[in-house]
């Protein structure tokens, strides 16, 4: 089914207001959920909203909380989210990283006691739209086995890197082959994943999303490489924020909250003049796109370049929403 942007946003806002979220906060939060969904990231927009509301009702999310600065060391700052709404806080933290970068050329904000930020790519995009290189990542609850293990001990720990090209080039990836949100998208669509997503109960690689959702045996991206990347991202986020690690979130909390996050903005125009920057970026993009195709009918694309077209399509023709998800939201 298709739903208009405004209808989606108003439904999000209705549910938030019904839970006594302040009107201005409900408006901004609903807008961010609608923007994420319109951009085609359904897994962390409309599909994620019911779980977000569940955590709000349990008290994991404190809607009136505001992040506060704990420590400033020039280009690096520590902040405490106080369990505020994740996507609103993340947006503020990337804005702050850009402000610091305006002074020092680079800005780093390390955040503790944060909630799930929903679409992490939105914050990299936020920086790149204003001409900065945007880098951010978060740790999580333990939802993936380290390489060689059966038991979940590491996070998917999404990493985002966005570069101010035209259109914006952005990698937005978890350290697993698939996030749980994308597994849900495939399951709801009744299809297998395109590549192996995890292990079945016998330890064999599988593309069945439901199996991996149930047994929690996600496949790390690049096998041992994704496992290792997850671990070091967790270490850095924990140290810079003085916040909780994956191990601590998992052992001390009953759900995924009070996570640690990093936001980095780099003012690249201080390092290279505009014309040279554009020439170099266009050279890179053209060199990649003009490689001989493995399939003549399938164009080579750069990461993130699809979002502009997806958003335009959804704006013109309505946003695809799974009927069961929509009915769930309507019932909240």
From Swiss-Prot:
Q: Which reaction does it catalyse?
A: 3-dehydro-L-gulonate + NAD(+) = 2,3-dioxo-L-gulonate + NADH + H(+); 3-dehydro-L-gulonate + NADP(+) = 2,3-dioxo-L-gulonate + NADPH + H(+)
* TM stretches of this protein: none
- Primary site of residence: cytoplasm
- GO MF annotation: an example: 3-dehydro-L-gulonate 2-dehydrogenase activity
- SUPFAM superfamilies from the UniProt entry: L-sulfolactate dehydrogenase-like
Cellular compartments per GO CC: cytoplasm
Source superkingdom:
Bacteria
EC class: oxidoreductase
Q: Which EC number(s) are documented for this chain? A: 1.1.1.130
Annotated active site = 44
Q: Please give the InterPro entries that the UniProt record associates with this protein.
A: Diketo_gul_Rdtase, Mal/L-sulf/L-lact_DH-like_ah, Mal/L-sulf/L-lact_DH-like_NADP, Mal/L-sulfo/L-lacto_DH-like_sf, Malate/L-lactate_DH-like
- Asked if the Swiss-Prot or TrEMBL record annotates the protein with the keyword Lipoprotein, the reply is no
Keyword vocabulary terms for this entry:
Cytoplasm, NAD, Oxidoreductase
Provide the residue positions that the database annotates as binding NAD(+): 168-174, 224-225, 304-306
Q: Which Pfam families match?
A: Ldh_2
Compartments (UniProt record)? Cytoplasm
Biological role: Catalyzes the reduction of 2,3-diketo-L-gulonate in the presence of NADH, to form 3-keto-L-gulonate.
Complex formation: Homodimer.
Give the family per the record: Belongs to the LDH2/MDH2 oxidoreductase family. DlgD subfamily.
* HAMAP family on file: Diketo_gul_reduc
What is the protein name stated in its UniProt record? 2,3-diketo-L-gulonate reductase
> Source taxonomy lineage?
Bacteria, Pseudomonadati, Pseudomonadota, Gammaproteobacteria, Pasteurellales
Q: Which gene encodes it?
A: dlgD
